[in-house]
């Protein structure tokens, strides 16, 4: 399975797109997208015991390359979201939003812990923002409030990430109006949707090892596998399969809305890679027995999932090719 090494290669393309002038650059400002929406308050992180227990914080709490911030979400009843930020060296630089995998930072499934994203972007002179929460949420606006272990209360992640956060955060970072958004696994669906729902806001979008389709029987059950782990259901999130809101959140059905945005789309084959082996997890400090058990689960269950994701990616490519919408694939 190609995991985060390929994601960082894709990140290089995203960074290159942002740093270089491109045709069809983002035209909408955060203020225009937010409209009358109440905005986040961005401040220095005051870590809770939960945050202090997370691997990313343990590894980077004293690393000056990572700015530790937090932002409130008015639409989620003032919930405080930790942010890991790799700031640009200079003002007036672009911003890349990286969305975490299914378990997010709550389960150490985040970009900082699972990759060398800090080393990679440290001298790229772009602002990189990683929201360190949102496990199993699909980073979307839910129709109903779940009451699970990870999914509890209002889930209005798209509102937070596209309307509440960018204005205050980008102002604090002295950023310009060029931005990209990228997601992996679960959030690879989310990054496509946010670009579709906010045309003209993002210059580039990365979708790594995810599934654009959501409103078809098999793909809808993929949603269930993920959100059930957080204590929610796809019906609570987007309504019944094929409902208007589910179709609105199907990136394959709405692929035309990606026209004019630079696209980087990557999937895995389902074959095991270095980061699926016991030795990789032992090197990360895991107990050897747990490492071998986890590796076996990854290679069997993960292989099936990633093979399905590969099929999803080919479906999206076929649709985009038919529409003459260019994208870079890996």
Predicted features along the sequence, with ranges:
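Non-catalytic cap/lid and distal C-terminal segments of serine-dependent acyl enzymes
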Residues: 2-330
């Amino acid at each position: 399975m190609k995991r985060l090494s390929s994601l960082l290669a894709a990140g290089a393309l995203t960074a290159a797109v942002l740093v270089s002038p491109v045709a069809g650059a983002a035209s909408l400002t955060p203020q225009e997208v937010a409209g009358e929406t109440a905005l986040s308050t961005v401040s220095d992180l005051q870590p809770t015991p939960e945050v202090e227990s997370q691997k990313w914080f343990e590894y980077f709490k004293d690393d000056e390359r990572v700015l530790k911030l937090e932002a409130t979400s008015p639409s989620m009843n003032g919930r405080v979201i930790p942010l890991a930020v790799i700031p640009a060296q200079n003002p007036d630089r672009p911003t890349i939003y990286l969305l975490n995998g299914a378990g997010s930072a709550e389960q150490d499934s985040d970009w900082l812990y699972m990759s060398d994203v800090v080393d990679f972007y440290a001298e790229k002179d772009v602002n990189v923002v990683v929201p360190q929460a949102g496990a199993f949420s699909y980073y979307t606006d839910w129709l109903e409030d779940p009451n699970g272990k990870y999914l509890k209360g209002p889930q209005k992640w798209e509102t937070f990430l596209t309307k509440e956060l960018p204005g205050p955060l980008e102002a604090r970072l002295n950023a310009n109006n060029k931005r990209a958004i990228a997601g992996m696994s679960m959030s690879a669906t989310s990054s496509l949707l946010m670009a579709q729902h906010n045309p003209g806001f993002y210059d580039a979008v990365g979708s790594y090892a995810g599934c654009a389709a959501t409103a078809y029987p098999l793909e809808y059950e993929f949603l269930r596998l993920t959100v059930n782990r957080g204590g929610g259901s796809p019906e609570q999130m987007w309504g019944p399969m094929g409902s208007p809101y589910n179709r609105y959140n199907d990136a394959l059905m709405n692929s035309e809305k990606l026209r004019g945005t630079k696209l980087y789309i990557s999937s895995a084959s389902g074959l095991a890679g270095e980061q699926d082996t016991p030795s990789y997890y032992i090197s990360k400090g895991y107990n050897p027995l747990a490492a071998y058990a986890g590796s076996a689960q990854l290679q069997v269950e993960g292989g099936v999932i990633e093979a399905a994701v590969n099929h999803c990616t080919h479906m999206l490519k076929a649709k985009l090719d038919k529409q003459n919408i260019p994208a870079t694939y890996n």
